[in-house]
Amino acid sequence: MDHAATMRRMYDLLNAGDVDGFGDELADDFVDHEELPGLAPTKEGVKTFFRMYIAAFPDLRMDAEDILTSGDKVVARSRATGTHQGEFMGMPATGKAVDVQLIDIIRFGDDGLAYEHWGVFDTMTMMQQLGAVPEGPPA
């Protein structure tokens, strides 16, 4: 199976706002090891998160810049962009653009579905871009 193609398809589905289609790529017993504040680390929890995220950033784009595969795992170094147009995690819309880097690691099963996810998202940069956290001094 071409797990890299599945990873790209998952991003494409999110870019199209198709959270249910994205969810179809997840196994029923999917586990997310990346903390989603206030949400269960399950298939339904992840779908809820992306519904909230897309409501807040309706022009969300997730683009894989590099994809590496090894056995049943895929690693994507990606970029998420969008404009904050709705409430997100208690923060009212700011109208500001975000451009954030992230890493996704997915373990796929023999059936081609995603069973586990580990991720790192540059939340600090996003909060600085939204004006919720002051930017630090230049490096």
Language-model features, listed with the residues they occupy:
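C-terminal and inter-domain tail/linker signature
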Residues: 1-139
